[in-house]
Amino acid sequence: MRLPELRQRLRDHGAAPCHAGRVLRAWVAGRPLDNRRQRAEDFLPLRLRNALPGLFDELRNLAQVHSEHPGEDGSARLLVRLADGQTVESVLLPRDGVCVSTQVGCAVGCVFCMTGRAGLLRQLSGAEIVAQVVLARSRRPVRKVVFMGMGEPAHNLDNVLDAIELLGLEGGIGHKNLVFSTVGDRRVFERLPQSTVKPARALSLHTTDRALRRRLLPRAPDIAPQELVELGEAYARRTGYPIQYQWTLLEGINDTEAELEGIARLLAGRYAVMNLIPYNATEADGFNRPSWARAAEMARRLHRRGVLAKLRHSAGQDVDGGCGQLRARALDAAPVLARRPLPSAETPAASPKAAASIGFPG
């Protein structure tokens, strides 16, 4: 169910804008329609009240917990079953946050990510995205939503922006606490500044070397890291929210001295935060995360060079809950494989035009 369809159905049942807002706020908050000041029967039209039990049943069925995997850090990985039987992952974060998925699978094909191995299976609707937040709120308070789960939000832009608008206007979540993550897609830089709700931004950078980035993110738009940073900086200055750069640390690949110099050159003095995230290793690819001492050293040295760098724990490492791992295990689709080699430097990367030609319906 898409969010415009949900709003239309409410109108068809006699809901005026004030009635629809009341219903949507109750759903997103996971609270009953009645409150201490006003009962639903004194406010909502009878036809709408009669239709709501069936509608709420549909909304509950959009996303249900298939399995839950608590982590020692206070996080919990949820394998979420959708109404058609497909599954995605959500993560309850330690401090009142949730990480949600935007697609079943992913077309970007990052070589260190389990999600992209099966490719893109389908888009999530805006209602399915919001339903993950509702599910999280049934377990703990949620004041922050990060769109960093399975999928590339830029490839499902209309539905993701619909979800962001609902969460920001009716869901009680501050705009800067809605974090849109992307590998870097020009459509995002064009659309987000025009949105009513302007979320914070996270950019998956992972390297300052353009050729290496093509190999790590083989189907991402081929935008030079320098240009990505310039685009990110412009958005940060416009919204007043610092850009978050995501950097999955891979031992011997992007934890080198050359990368340290590259990060300092690109980000020193920028309105930005560099999140260094040691890789969540799996048996299926053979990549390794560097030692914690090496990761901490990188963060310290970047601080000294004028880069606000934070060393992050990847939520769920102790339960092997990296992006796509729970789903792969549930599908029995994670055989032990030899390490996948990086594509050779000669392998042609997907051009922005080629990436745009792939169909990503809204």
Swiss-Prot record:
Disulphide bonds in the chain: C99-C323
Main location: cytoplasm
Ranges where the record places region Disordered: 342-362
UniProt-annotated location(s): Cytoplasm
Active site per database record: E89 (proton acceptor), C323 (s-methylcysteine intermediate)
Record text on cofactor binding: Binds 1 [4Fe-4S] cluster. The cluster is coordinated with 3 cysteines and an exchangeable S-adenosyl-L-methionine.
GO BP annotation list: rRNA base methylation; tRNA methylation
Keywords: 4Fe-4S, Cytoplasm, Disulfide bond, Iron, Iron-sulfur, Metal-binding, Methyltransferase, S-adenosyl-L-methionine, Transferase
Cofactor(s) required, per the database record: [4Fe-4S] cluster
Protein name: Probable RNA methyltransferase Tbd_1951
Origin species: Thiobacillus denitrificans (strain ATCC 25259 / T1)
